[in-house]
Amino acid sequence: MTESQQQPVFVIEKIYVKDLSLEIPHAPRIFLEREAPEINFQLATSHNAVDGEIHEVVVTATVTARLKEKDQVMFLVEAHQTGIFRIGNVPGDEVEPVLSVLCPNILFPYLRETISDTVTRAGFPPVILNPVNFEAIYHQKKQQETAGEQPDQPADTITRH
């Protein structure tokens, strides 16, 4: 085998928005409100093999802005930021961390920009998503699997208020 055949391969083939939706159920009246909304942020990751060394990784965010006093949704935006990655010459037990940690870390800044841009274009102040520690989420998931626990929600899903 030549040296190039033994080197790990990691290539970003494509980064794109697979799905994007925005709902403003109480428009246009909601734009007259002065109350600061409560922001709820949910994040999930998934991945699947497409073909051989090609993998699809999806980071999904759902952001809901709600007026607490009136119990009204100002807006709800959901985005599926997706990447196609080529991963080769990597030991089998190391592929999962690449798909669960490295790839979501690459996709998250794009997702953050998509959410912020969509919300701003809808006429609201931008929503800035805080950084996410995908490594901690991955290790938590592995610990739960080792302990045989069934979490209330998948370990690769987080909710923030």
Swiss-Prot record:
The keyword Hydrolase does not apply. Residues 141-161 are annotated as: Disordered. The keyword Cytoplasm applies. It holds the Pfam family SecB. InterPro entries: SecB, SecB-like_sf. GO terms for biological process: protein folding; protein tetramerization; protein transport. Coiled coil: none annotated. GO terms for cellular component: cytoplasm. Disulfide bonds: none annotated. Keywords: Chaperone, Cytoplasm, Protein transport, Translocation, Transport. One of its GO terms (molecular function) is unfolded protein binding. Homotetramer, a dimer of dimers. One homotetramer interacts with 1 SecA dimer. One of the proteins required for the normal export of preproteins out of the cell cytoplasm. It is a molecular chaperone that binds to a subset of precursor proteins, maintaining them in a translocation-competent state. It also specifically binds to its receptor SecA. Belongs to the SecB family. PANTHER family: PROTEIN-EXPORT PROTEIN SECB, PTHR36918. This is Protein-export protein SecB.
